[in-house]
Amino acid sequence: MTEQTPAVSEERGYRKALRGIVVSDKMDKTIVVEVQDRKKHSLYGKVMKTSKRVKAHDEENTAGVGDRVRIAETRPLSASKRWRLVEVVERAK
């Protein structure tokens, strides 16, 4: 008799992906990306622009200041890095 063990599938959970503009690349293998979002005020309904700056891991130092990039959420890589560079969408002019 053969036992059939269920296949163990370790699927990753949902990971966020953002687009933003590189504002700093002075660190080694790290870029700072500014991500903009629009949020509606809960009481008054006005649409406001919000922005946040996140540090992302850039393994090959490919992104430069002004580049439009896509980043994805990942495990903590350092005290402040929780994002990684997926691709450079558009180079700075």
UniProtKB/Swiss-Prot annotation:
Ligase is among the record's keywords: no
Gene3D superfamilies xrefs: Nucleic acid-binding proteins (2.40.50.140)
Keyword line: Ribonucleoprotein, Ribosomal protein, RNA-binding, rRNA-binding
GO molecular-function term, one example from the UniProt record: structural constituent of ribosome
Pfam families referenced in this protein's UniProt entry, alphabetically: Ribosomal_S17
Gene Ontology biological process terms from the UniProt entry: translation
GO cellular component terms attached to this protein's record: cytosolic small ribosomal subunit
Superkingdom field: Bacteria
InterPro entries (UniProt xref): NA-bd_OB-fold, Ribosomal_uS17, Ribosomal_uS17_bact/chlr, Ribosomal_uS17_CS
Cited function: One of the primary rRNA binding proteins, it binds specifically to the 5'-end of 16S ribosomal RNA.
Family in the record: Belongs to the universal ribosomal protein uS17 family.
Assembly behavior: Part of the 30S ribosomal subunit.
Protein name: Small ribosomal subunit protein uS17
Annotated source species: Micrococcus luteus (strain ATCC 4698 / DSM 20030 / JCM 1464 / CCM 169 / CCUG 5858 / IAM 1056 / NBRC 3333 / NCIMB 9278 / NCTC 2665 / VKM Ac-2230) (Micrococcus lysodeikticus)
